[in-house]
Amino acid sequence: VGTPLLARSGRDAHLTEAGEVLARHATSILARLSAAEEEIAAIAGLHAGCVRLVSFLSGTSTVIPPALAALRAERPEVEVTLSEATPPRAIAMLRNGDCDIALAFRYPELPGAAPGAPGTHPQDPGTEGEEDADWDGLAAHPLLTDRLVGLLPEGHHLAGAGKLELADLAGETWILGCASCRRHVVKVCESTGFTPRMDLTTDDYPTVIGLVGAGMGVSVLPELALSSLPSGTVRLVPIVPTIQREVVALTLPAYESVPAVRLMLQHLKSAARLAGQALDGTSLPPR
């Protein structure tokens, strides 16, 4: 390439700036080669196809199961692998060629916020490095919008309210879930004039629900995470103004023409429509 790619220091070697550029482009090239091989093999009828899925937790438990069932019913010979990862990690896997489709989500930027700025907070060190990953250059297939709702213990004095503003919970102890969600909730709370006191954080949504039900605090969670909410433990209250995240299926543009990937995307969209209808059918007011 006409310029050194490695620099040596004693027994060690590291990439030069030119080497880092080449390595970054190489991962994209390898991913495109993998897609080309898959497409050629499918067209030639050498094998039925394989789809590697990565999804965030609440997507794995709601959208993914009916989509996989529909795919198996239509094309039982298609192989599918599934793993879980946060959106930043899932997108990195997609760019590195380690998966074919990544389910991800992101929240809209707040007015006055720097685009892409990481919302770290001293009470929440787990958010560091979890800023929303860049979707540039990826093919995004919209699936649904997922709003956040308030969770209160049954005996809470606001449990019977028809709606809540986050400021109504300013003096409460908060229990929040995944890093991306709690980072955005903290940003919204701070924009309304207070910082939530987070004594407990966990990426496990059933744990959040259990802690709220036990009276340990209040929470705000995505509706998708509440699809199997046990009855009689917590009270759901809509948050105003509405806070919602965009849920999408991401893939590389080169993968969209691979038959198995294209079919999986179709079934993900159908499953997402059903999930959205199920959310609209809850006891909460219409979305």
Region locations from a protein language model:
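Secondary-structure junction motif
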Residues: 105-106, 152, 158-162, 172-192, ...
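Hydrophobic hinge/microswitch elements
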Residues: 60, 86-91, 95-99, 105, ...
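Alpha-helical linker/hinge and terminal dimerization helices associated
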Residues: 1, 22-44, 268
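A short LG(V/I)-centered, amphipathic sequence patch enriched
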Residues: 1-15
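Short amphipathic alpha-helical coupling segments at ligand-binding clamshell hinges
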Residues: 18-25, 63, 67, 184, ...
